[in-house]
UniProtKB/Swiss-Prot annotation:
Post-translational modification: After cleavage, the post-translationally modified ChM-I is secreted as a glycoprotein.
Descriptive protein name: Leukocyte cell-derived chemotaxin 1
Membrane spanning residue stretches: 45-65
Region (Disordered): 218-268
Ranges of Polar residues composition bias in the record: 242-257
Glycosylation sites: 243
Disulfide-bonded cysteines: 131-193, 282-286, 283-323, 293-317, 297-313
UniProt cross-references to PANTHER family, sorted A to Z: CHONDROMODULIN-RELATED, LEUKOCYTE CELL-DERIVED CHEMOTAXIN 1
One Pfam family of this chain: BRICHOS
One GO location term (cellular component): extracellular region
Tissue: Detected in cartilage and cardiac valves (at protein level). Detected in the laminae fibrosa, spongiosa and ventricularis layers of normal cardiac valves (at protein level). Expression is decreased cardiac valves of patients with valvular heart disease (at protein level). Weakly expressed in chondrosarcoma.
GO biological process, one term: negative regulation of angiogenesis
């Protein structure tokens, strides 16, 4: 009886006896849980590292933007031109040595970019079919600090700027052919002009001033071109006599203004002399800033003979600061 009770056939084994037939499971229970736990740890480390990198990248980008923006300052003001109030703005970018002036809005907007690094000024009018460039002195714009920003803002913000707009001032007229190679222009001027053709501007004067200049030339030229001996060498002098009505500042042989000594000056230094006032960079006798406007016109009836007959004149304005202010900025006094 005891032998029969110990030996149980496999066919008679019930559901309760299955655990006695299964192999031991303790060997697999210690290996399987380790693999997903390790993956979770690696994933957590990757996520934390990525978050830290993003945080440092955001902080670096913020400080880079803040540092680059510290070299740029914007100010808005109001000017009165012929009894009409117009809004204007000035942007000083000391890092790129640029000044940007905007006047008016909509169809009457005019934008001028003064590139002091290359000695070029770009001008564009809203709705115009041309973009203009003219000679500009080469200089270095001093960095504008926080104290200076407050000084400029207190002088310009919320005030009506006086406008210097003389009838006897220079009038800039576009030449007949656009610029073929614009590689010498900065990216800011090219961005301003876009796809528009670019034309050089040449200086001229109103007819009354031109008559006075011609009278002076007629008195001077005969004494300077007279030669003691007649011959073939006197022909160039006669040629110059035929062109005596052509103002010397309107020569086409040079792209830049020949009366401007700064284009021949190397380096980034700016000399404080009366030409700064003459060229409209700053005002020597002024104690406050003002708005300086220039007329830009299209020729009427062809480009030759001189002097120009012009039409369709529009104004481009900029803010002129006292020369003492610029010198103080260069010396670090303000």
């Amino acid at each position: 009886m005891t032998e029969n009770s110990d030996k149980v056939p496999i066919a008679l084994v019930g559901p309760d006896d299955v655990e006695f037939c299964s192999p031991p499971a303790y060997a697999t229970l210690t290996v399987k849980p380790s693999s997903p736990a390790r993956l979770l740890k690696v994933g957590a480390v990757v996520l934390i590292s990525g978050a830290v990198l993003l945080l440092f990248g955001a902080i670096g980008a913020f400080y880079f933007w803040k540092g680059s923006d510290s070299h740029i300052y914007n100010v808005h003001y109001t000017m009165s031109i012929n009894g009409k109030l117009q809004d204007g703005s000035m942007e000083i970018d000391a890092g790129n040595n640029l000044e940007t002036f905007k006047m008016g809005s909509g169809a009457e907007e005019a934008i001028a970019v003064n590139d002091f690094q290359n000695g070029i000024t770009g001008i564009r009018f809203a709705g115009g079919e041309k973009c203009y460039i003219k000679a500009q002195v080469k200089a270095r714009i001093p960095e504008v600090g926080a104290v200076t920003k407050q000084s400029i803002s207190s002088k310009l913000e919320g005030k009506i700027m006086p406008v210097k707009y003389e009838e006897n001032s220079l009038i800039w007229v576009a030449v007949d052919q656009p610029v073929k190679d614009n590689s010498f222009l900065s990216s800011k001027v090219l961005e301003l002009c876009g796809d528009l053709p670019i034309f050089w501007l040449k200086p001229t004067y109103p007819k009354e001033i031109q008559r006075e200049r011609r009278e002076v030339v007629r008195k001077i030229v005969p004494t300077t071109t007279k030669r003691p001996h007649s011959g073939p060498r006197s022909n160039p002098g006669a040629g110059r006599l035929n062109n005596e009505t052509r103002p010397s500042v309107q020569e086409d042989s040079q792209a830049f203004n020949p009366d401007n000594p700064y284009h021949q000056q190397e380096g980034e230094s700016m000399t404080f002399d009366p030409r700064l006032d003459h060229e409209g960079i700053c005002c020597i006798e002024c104690r406050r800033s003002y708005t300086h406007c220039q007329k830009i016109c299209e020729p009427l009836g062809g480009y030759y003979p001189w002097p120009y007959n012009y039409q369709g004149c529009r104004s481009a304005c900029r803010v002129i600061m006292p020369c003492s202010w610029w010198v103080a900025r260069i010396l670090g006094m303000v």
